[in-house]
Design a protein with these regions (language model features):
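Alpha-helical interface subdomain recognition
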Residues: 1-89, 135-136, 211-373
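N-terminal glycine-rich flavin-associated loop
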Residues: 41, 92-108
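FAD-binding core of flavoproteins
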Residues: 103, 107-226, 230, 366-373
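Serine/threonine-rich low-complexity intrinsically disordered regions
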Residues: 15, 32-35, 98, 113, ...
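Generic hydrophobic, aliphatic-rich segments that mediate packing or membrane embedding
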Residues: 51, 78-82, 97-101, 113-115
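Poly-acidic low-complexity segments
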Residues: 48, 94, 146, 165, ...
Length: 373
């Protein structure tokens, strides 16, 4: 869980001091608090409000916000253990979305409100549009993460960013959920007013919430993938059949190796994208279009690994893995849900294919080989 790429892009396996501090803090918190009982209560419709207060007390929602704006001042790479741990422990909170929303607000020079924040990309998953003056929203959007739990929504329209109070009468909400029973609601906006408006400076990242949301999901997917690998290896070593652990069987070893390999590739792809995001938000040299490419690669790798891992881990566990009594479903239901959110692996593979066609064979190859990983 500690392999990193440093800010210079060198895979030295040594986390920064801030990354280590954040990782230790969030690991201790989730290991103690995200219990089977909490997850079962969440599935039964009870929000994890006490856990949310704990993450607030630890300063996690503002991890990506500059210290001058009241946050921790962490880079995307330094804050990545939070996203990873959300997935590893399957923490049922709008924490990843709040981190992203707060980061965008701070980047645009806007005040970050207290409380959970959801994020919306105008023009995606519906017909929601921001008016020319940037003061009102009209339209409908589906699959909004955690809308019922959030008072605030950050809506991006290319480089314009607005903060919206979801409790106003001009906004309607229809409840929905994903496979993991996480809130994925439908919102209707009828000339809804915006609380504040700002301007992003993320040139070439034309859909910032869509792209960075995909990066966030890729990171949480990697965390869940590593949890699934750990569960599969542990079960294969403990389950004895015909006098020896089933993990000794060659076919199972091959399955586990495939799953671990795909997980490792997804983790490295997300680390590269996190490095690019850190460069962009901290104003270091780098191409924003390179970040878009890196995010696409990360989401493709994470989505494909999720499909493979969910299948393999259930084969390893056999019938017991499909029971509600076993904890495996908390992880695999999130794999099935998150792989499609903010664009499926098929969507982002198409984006990569279009990039290759647009650049031509010589241009695309040069773009790959000239990049510093």
């Amino acid at each position: 869980m500690n392999t990193t790429i440093n800010h210079q892009g060198v895979d030295d396996g040594v986390p920064s001091e801030m990354q280590t501090m954040i990782a230790d803090s969030v690991e201790r918190l989730f290991a103690r608090q995200v219990t089977r009982e909490l997850l079962e209560r969440f599935d039964d419709g009870h929000r994890a409000d006490s856990l949310w207060q704990m993450v607030v007390d630890n300063g996690l929602p503002g991890a990506l916000v500059a210290e001058a704006a009241g946050g921790s001042g962490a880079s995307w790479l330094d804050a990545s253990p939070v996203l990873h741990s959300i997935g590893y422990w399957q923490a049922p909170l709008p924490l990843a979305e709040t981190m992203l929303g707060a980061a965008l607000l701070a980047h645009a020079g806007m005040e970050v409100p207290e409380g959970p924040i959801t994020v919306i990309q105008a023009g995606r998953l519906g017909d929601l549009q921001l008016d020319e003056g940037g003061t009102h929203l009209q339209g409908r959007v589906v699959n909004v993460p955690w809308a019922r739990s959030c008072r605030w929504a950050v809506v991006a329209d290319s480089q314009r960013l607005v903060l919206v109070d979801l409790r106003q009468a001009a906004i309607t909400l229809a409840a929905g959920s994903n496979f993991a029973d996480e809130e994925r609601d439908t919102l209707g906006f009828v000339n809804a007013s915006c609380q504040s408006t700002g301007q992003l400076k993320l040139a070439d990242l034309h859909e910032p919430v869509w792209h960075l949301g995909a990066l966030v999901r890729a990171c949480t997917l990697v965390g869940t993938l590593e949890a699934v690998v750990d569960k599969a290896v542990m079960y294969a070593n403990e389950r004895v059949q015909f006098g020896k652990p089933i993990g000794k069987q060659q076919v199972l070893q091959q399955y586990l190796a495939q799953m671990a390999g795909a997980t490792g590739a997804a983790r490295m792809a997300t680390q590269v994208a996190l490095r690019s995001a850190s460069d962009l938000f901290l104003g270091r040299a780098g191409s924003h279009s390179t970040l878009a490419f890196d995010i696409a690669v990360a989401k493709v790798c994470a989505g494909e690994a999720a499909t493979l891992a969910a299948s393999v881990v259930h084969q390893v566990h056999g019938a017991i893995g499909f029971t509600h009594e076993h904890t495996l479903h908390f992880a695999t239901r999130r794999l099935w849900s998150w792989r499609d959110e903010f664009g499926s692996d098929a969507h982002w593979a198409k984006v990569l294919g279009q990039s290759a066609i647009a650049a031509g064979s010589e241009g695309f190859w040069a773009g790959l080989t000239d990049r510093s990983l």
